[in-house]
Every structure is written in C-alpha cells, then in structure tokens.
C-alpha cells in the first residue's frame, strides 16, 4: 500500500490535495488566533515547535498531492512551504491588533519544518520504490 501512495497515478493524490487545502486553512486559523486567547505553555519555545510541525505536515501533504517526486517538485514544495510561512508572518505583522506579531524565528521554524516535511516524503517514497 505504501508504494501505491507514492505513484504518479495514485488515487490518494486527490485526497491528499483536499487534506493539503484543509491543513493550509488550519494553519491560517491557528496563526491568527488573538494572542491573549492562546494557551500558556511550560515547554520552551512551544510556539516554534508548533510552527515546525504545522509546516512539516503541510509540505509532506503538498508532496503527496504533487505530480511527481522529481527534484523540481521537492524544491517547489520547499519554496511553497517557506513562502507560505513568510506570508503568514507578514500578515501577522499587518494585523498586530490581534495581539500577534511578525517573528523571524517563526519564519525559521516554518522553513525548517518545510524542509523536514520534504525530507520525510523523499525518504518514504525512496523506501516504497525500493520495495516495489
């Protein structure tokens, strides 16, 4: 089943596109919750970890929904993930009345998470191709 999920004509691609759109909307919603409404956490840099995971999942889903596993697709997913993270942060800066602010550290967390999502996809696709 794993190797079927990574083929070009996979029936999972359409579902992955839907999940990618839903996940992107979830990122937008979570990133624009007013600052005072956010729960407190004792975990150091908890918000950075949240950004990291959100964008790792986003780029992984993007790759699952994508047309191929070529290097150009991997790079496109990475650029889209980084650009999406940057856009979210820019919008947070513009909408500072929500109690949110633009953070370069969040952009770094988004970008590193995006890279991890692409890497995880590549490793799983490579393993699936090896066992096929």
Region locations from a protein language model:
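Bulky hydrophobic segments
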Residues: 1-104, 111, 115-132
